[in-house]
Every structure is written in structure tokens, then in C-alpha cells.
Amino acid sequence: MDKVLDSALLSSANKRKGILAIGAHPDDIELGCGASLARLAQKGIYIAAVVMTTGNSGTDGIIDRHEESRNALKILGCHQTIHLNFADTRAHLQLNDMISALEDIIKNQIPSDVEIMRVYTMHDADRHQDHLAVYQASMVACRTIPQILGYETPSTWLSFMPQVFESVKEEYFTVKLAALKKHKS
């Protein structure tokens, strides 16, 4: 599975290998690929995380979901966390802006000594409109990255047919659970 990442810590361009994890809301990345990120971070791979929306729909606004997310992603080993403020439950209306934002992040905000080799993002068999929109934006914006993997979340349809499975040790699952505990909302 990790032939793209395991061969060496340097990419073909003599840059550090990197991962880009993209989620629609605070907690999506942690739920969907948290254990994998913890494993890859321990291997020394650079990890950047992008949370596309505020995630505040259905909350009273007192809890800062971005702060929860920053703390959780730090536990997973993310080196860089970027929170965008697209409207929660309205991501499908902002598709072009999300594509532009992701392209800008890839081009201008990832350190110049890092080459993104893999993307973890939402997938197209998800019933949440924000998840589906983030999947669509990710597929366009990340089209030049060698590997794009979709991760499962609780709103996944039964039609989701995973083709890649990552085996993770219990220690990484424990790290994932610790990260999820940072989400009080």
C-alpha cells in the first residue's frame, strides 16, 4: 500500500514527502483517516490538513470547532493545519471557490521543500452535501498529485466500495481516539 511513501522519506524531486488531508468539517479528518495520519507522522512524513468549513451548523456557536480541530490534528502529528471558512451545509454552492482555495494551498502554502504524494479526502459515496462537494473540489484541485484516497465517515452510503485498506496498529488507533476526544461539540 505505501509504495508511494515507504520507499524513502525524500521524493523524486529530492523533497520531503508529504500528505494532504482534506475534510469538510472539523472532525472529518480525524474520523476518516486519523490512525493512518498518526502512523505516517511517526514515519516522519510531513502532513498538512485542510478543514474546508466552519462546521458550526447545529451548534450554539460557543464552542470553537476550529480550536478543537487544531488540537486534535496536532495529536495526530499534523505539521500544518489550515482552516477555511466556507459556509457549513452550503459547500456545494461554493465549489469553484473551494477548488481555487485548495489549488492555492497546494501551490503557495505547502512548504517549498515538501512534495505532496498522497491526498486523503472525502469520497463520492457520501450522503452529506458538504462531504460530496469537498470530494469534488479535491478531485479537481489535487489532480496532479500521484495518489488520492477517499476515506469513510459515518455518513457514508452502503454503496461505498473501498479498494484500499490500510492496516494500522492499535497504538495508532489509540492516538486517533485521543484526537477525537478533543472534540467536545
Swiss-Prot record:
Q: Which keywords label this protein? A: Hydrolase
Q: Under which main EC class is this enzyme filed? A: hydrolase
Q: Name one Pfam family in it.
A: PIG-L
- Protein family membership: Belongs to the PIGL family.
An example Gene Ontology molecular-function term: hydrolase activity, acting on carbon-nitrogen (but not peptide) bonds, in linear amides
Q: Which organism is it from?
A: Escherichia coli (strain K12)
The EC number on file is 3.-.-.-
Q: What is this protein called?
A: Uncharacterized deacetylase YaiS
